Amino acid sequence: MNFLMSEEQSAIVDMASRLFADFCTDETIQQFWAGDEPYDRALWQALREGGLTALILPEDLGGSALGMTELCAVLESQGRRLAPAPLWPHQLAVAALAKFAEGAPGMAELADATRLATLSLEGLQQSRGLTLHARKTDAGWRLNGRAVAVPQAEQAALAVLPAQTAEGVRLFAVDPAQAGVERIGGRLTHHEPAADLVINDLELPTAAALGEQALDWLGPRVAACLGALQLGVSGEALKRAVAYTSERVQFGQPIAAFQAISQKTADCLIDVEALRSSLWQLVWRLDAGLDAAGAAGVVRAWTCDTGHRVTHAAQHMHGGVGVDVSYPIHRYTYWSRALEIACGGVTANLEALGRWLATPALTDADC
């Protein structure tokens, strides 16, 4: 079995890696964190011109109609450089609208990434319930409640939000700037802008509700994107820790030669490779059109666990340098924690995975 990327896939990853390397040095990322920009606009323009903002979008919208394999390979490169660009929430939101929404407004501009789309992770996490509710009306739907920490919500022209209905959770396309929506902005742990959307008696047409299968389609893909970013973040944090401990001399030898350090880095490598294996299993299942609920649960758990252990260890191995915020390693810890929180936490995900494993109808084909 050939696990290597195709020529086309390798070319996409190479282009993305070059762009992230050019725009996202340690110095430029430090400057970005010191500023107020929501994302790197020059990088976003370069990603648009390279077609990387439309990898999974259908061809009739100007996309490449590629799969999660290509997107996640690019996201791993993004994670390594901590690139400040809303690459995955924009693409998944637009792809979901294209697949499950009837005539969503402004799709051409969204597909071209001249206007941003985003999505809420509530309802896709395993750790808490929804605070946004939707009730059917004669004219369509009425929404009330709050969508918490929606990424880029103050910049987005359209947001895909999950809301609790009488029949279950449903996704809705909402313009965050319209009347009836209040945006309360802030920054997440890794400096990404986000906003709570407080919604009061927002009337939406029937077409604003995405198809009933949209949530099941979106959830595993969100897990894959978060896992790919975590793979890049954790892998690069480990790489930097290995480089530092190989150069840092104490008691006449590099500290990497000490048993405690070598064993800790070996444990970290096992964690990173476990995440890598589970991620590509999930991505393969998604692109093959197979059920991916169980694989997504495994990836969410590893995304939380791997990131927490690896970046904590990498920070620790840097010693006093690791707590100096002029040195870049702390930003990997912040990114890793943000991704862990976005996934809902390891405990909640392991509990959800246990419930899935206990499902009586589970067969070998589902694993």
Provide a role label for each language-model segment.
Residues 134-137, 164:
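Generic beta-strand structural signal
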Residues 1-81, 136, 140-141, 220-367:
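Alpha-helical interface subdomain recognition
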Residues 66, 128, 152-156:
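Short glycine/proline-enriched turns and hinge-like loops at secondary-structure junctions
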Residues 112-124:
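A short, Trp-centered hydrophobic/proline-enriched beta-strand micro-motif
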Residues 125-132:
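Active-site-adjacent elements of ketosynthase-type condensing enzymes
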Residues 84-103:
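N-terminal glycine-rich flavin-associated loop
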Residues 149-150, 175-206, 213-214:
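Flexible, small-/acidic-enriched active-site or ligand-binding loops
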Residues 144-181:
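A short core secondary-structure module
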